[in-house]
């Protein structure tokens, strides 16, 4: 086991298993099919991550909306300016669209159907929405967005992770191109 230093708020480690024998009685499923089993579980993971990203986007949007309403410059709230309003409003719209896709993925998953397309889209849209909301929040707070006091800098770092993990946006786009749109495999 080896710890991996990250910019996250939780521990990440590598675990290595070398020359481990698993008794037949302890096998999960059929030998040699493990990767397929893992793939089947990834839809649930993508739904879970999309849910977390939606929560992050809501947090960022609430923080930036509140700050924009309270912070005054030249005797008026900064949120009265469209240049401040629009990025926050757009991030909210992206979050709501991702949330609707997430509900569709959850519905299919709960019915026992394959939500591959919807789970992938929900994860991608939610990760993008969280990142857009994070950027709008930092921009709205200006220099205070980098201060540890507001927690924005920490959440900003965490929101970045879901652009690349547990599956990158590019892999999701490859999945959509191949499995949904019927295009040739790109890798």
Regions picked out by a protein language model, each given a short descriptive name:
Residues 52, 83-86, 93, 117, ...:
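Alpha-helical coiled-coil segments
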Residues 25-45, 67-81, 105, 139, ...:
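Conserved catalytic-core motifs characterized by acidic clusters
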């Amino acid at each position: 086991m080896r710890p991996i230093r990250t910019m996250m708020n939780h521990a990440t480690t590598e675990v290595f298993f070398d020359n481990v024998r698993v008794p037949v009685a302890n096998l999960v499923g059929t030998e040699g099919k493990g990767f397929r089993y893992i793939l089947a579980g990834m839809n649930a993971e993508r739904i879970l991550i999309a849910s977390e990203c939606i929560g992050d986007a809501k947090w960022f949007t609430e923080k930036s909306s509140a700050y924009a309403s309270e912070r005054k410059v030249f005797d008026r709230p900064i949120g009265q300016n469209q240049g401040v309003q629009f990025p926050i409003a757009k991030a909210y719209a992206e979050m709501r669209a991702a949330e609707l896709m997430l509900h569709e993925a959850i519905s299919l998953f709960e019915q026992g159907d394959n939500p591959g397309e919807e789970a992938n889209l929900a994860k991608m849209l939610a990760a993008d929405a969280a990142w857009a909301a994070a950027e709008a929040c930092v921009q709205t707070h200006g220099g205070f967005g980098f201060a540890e006091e507001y927690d924005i800098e920490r959440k900003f770092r965490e929101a970045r992770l879901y652009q690349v993990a547990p599956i990158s946006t590019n892999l999701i786009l490859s999945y959509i191109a191949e499995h949904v749109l019927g295009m040739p495999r790109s890798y």
